[in-house]
Amino acid sequence: MATLEGGAYNDALFGSRFSDFIHAHGGDDFVNGGNGHDLVFGDDGDDLLFGGKGNDTLFGGEGSDLLNGEDGHDTLVGGWGDDLLYGDKGNDILFGGHGSDLLSGGKGNDILYGGDGADILDGGKGNDVLAGGAGHDVFVFDGGGGNDVILDFTAGEDVLQISKGINGLDVSSPDDLASRITQVGGNVVVDLGHGDTLTLVNVDAHDIQANPDHYFTVH
C-alpha cells in the first residue's frame, strides 16, 4: 500500500493503481484515489475527494467537503461541515456526520445515514436503507428508485419529497400519495408504481391518511 501525504496548503493528490493511504492534512485539497481499495482522509479545509475504482473509504474531516465514491462498494463519512456525499456506482454506505449534508446513493443497494443537522437523503437506484438521524430531514424519491426503507421518519419534522407524476402515476398532491399506502404490521408501505415501494418503519397509516401534509410534499 502506497502512502501519500499532503501539507498545510491546497494540495492535489493522485493515488496509484494499487491500494493507497492518502492523508491530505490542511488546506482545500483535491484527492483522487485512482485504482485499488483506497483509504482517504481530507482533514481540515473544504476538500474534493474522489475514490476512483475499487472499494474505497473516504473521510471528509473538517470543513464542507465533497466526497464521491465513484466505482466500487464505497464508504463515505462526511465529518464536520455541510458536506456533499455521492456514492455513485456500487453498494455504498454514506454517513453525513455533523452539519446539513446532502447524501445521494446513486446506483446499487445503499445505506444512508444523515447524522446531525437538516439533511437531504436520496437513495437513487436500487433497494436502499435510509435514516435521517437528528434534525429536519428531507427524503427524496424519483421514479425507478426500487424498494427503499426509512428507519426513523418523524412526522412534522421530516418530509418525504416525491416527484410529481412519479412512474407515470396520477400523483400531484399529498392526498394522492396517502391513498396509496398499506399498513403491514407496524410499518407503512407506500406504492410508488412500477414495482417501486417505500417502507416507513413504525408509522401508522391512519395518521398519514389524517395528516398527509405532515408526511408528503410533491414536486
Where are these regions (language model features)?
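Acidic, glycine-rich calcium-binding repeat modules characteristic of RTX/beta-roll
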Residues: 3-5, 10-14, 19-174
